[in-house]
């Protein structure tokens, strides 16, 4: 790290992203990963796990809104939601903006990520004390495998990159377990890296795994996240019946909460397929 800057380099792609920083305000080695928090000059606080940018306060809303609202508005009546990963709690915040959601279970392997977020990113953790929220710190792979069949409406997989402990979240076996836990019309959304950098290494294999797991439809959402490699990110939507392009449009336009990025037009546009992903 050059003095005064934090840099995340993607060596294989010959690209790097840097943020000017004022100071590192927290550092620890948890049981699972190296956790750092920086105060940047213009992007608010920065959360870094094992050297990789997880979020900045300036652009976190882009990722968290798009990982939550398209799936929730695509489901006809989302009441039971599970988040696998999501330790920073930003997706939990967005999910519980929906008044119809009755219960959301967040299953995060590393409790320290959540506790660090509660201390240094309180705006992400505003739903942690919601009576509809349940935080559980355990292995998401095992939890999904043991989940009651047809007990969930929406599953959101907010994992780190598909290496190490997170690699199992991108497999046919895991997605088969997720599909079993979903009720009719159930939806899973999973972060799937950059369309520009990871089309062949992540997105295409995840689509194949989802199809092999028996999902009726597999779709890619694309959206900007400037602090992530390439600045262009994706999530993969997998459905047990239905089509996320046929969403509750009126509800999304009259939602009883404010968003900074997501709306009905963005929902439609994010599901449009660029030529390079066809």
From Swiss-Prot:
InterPro entries: PABS (IPR030374), PABS_CS (IPR030373), SAM-dependent_MTases_sf (IPR029063), Spermi_synthase (IPR001045), Spermidine_synt_N (IPR035246), Spermidine_synt_N_sf (IPR037163). Spermidine binds at residues 64, 88, 158-161. It comes from the Bacteria. Pathway: Amine and polyamine biosynthesis; spermidine biosynthesis; spermidine from putrescine: step 1/1. GO terms for cellular component: cytosol. Residues 3-240 form the PABS domain. This is Polyamine aminopropyltransferase. It comes from Halorhodospira halophila (strain DSM 244 / SL1) (Ectothiorhodospira halophila (strain DSM 244 / SL1)). The gene is speE.
């Amino acid at each position: 790290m050059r003095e005064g800057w934090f840099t995340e380099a993607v060596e294989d792609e010959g690209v790097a992203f840097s943020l000017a920083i004022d100071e590192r305000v927290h550092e620890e080695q948890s049981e699972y990963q190296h956790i750092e928090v920086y105060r940047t000059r213009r992007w608010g606080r920065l959360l870094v796990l094992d050297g990789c940018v997880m979020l900045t306060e300036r652009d976190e809303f882009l990722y968290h809104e798009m990982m939550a609202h398209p799936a929730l508005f695509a489901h006809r009546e989302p009441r039971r939601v599970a988040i696998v990963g999501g330790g920073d709690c930003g997706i939990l915040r967005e999910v519980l903006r929906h008044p119809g959601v009755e219960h959301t279970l967040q299953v995060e392997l590393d409790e320290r990520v959540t506790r660090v977020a509660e201390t240094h990113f309180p705006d992400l953790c505003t739903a942690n004390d919601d009576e509809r929220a349940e935080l559980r710190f355990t292995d998401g792979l095992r939890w999904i495998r043991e989940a009651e069949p047809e007990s969930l409406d929406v599953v959101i997989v907010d994992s780190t990159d598909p290496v190490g402990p997170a690699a199992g979240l991108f497999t046919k076996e895991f997605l088969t377990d997720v599909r079993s836990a979903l009720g009719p019309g159930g939806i899973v959304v999973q972060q799937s890296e950059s369309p520009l950098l990871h089309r062949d290494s992540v997105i295409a294999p995840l689509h194949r795994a989802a199809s092999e797991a028996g999902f009726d439809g597999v779709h890619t959402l694309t959206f900007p996240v400037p602090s992530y490699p390439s600045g262009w990110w994706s999530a993969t939507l997998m459905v047990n019946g239905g089509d996320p392009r046929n969403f509750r449009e009126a509800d999304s336009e009259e939602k009883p909460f404010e968003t900074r990025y997501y709306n009905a037009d963005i929902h439609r546009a994010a599901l449009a397929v660029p030529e390079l992903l066809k």
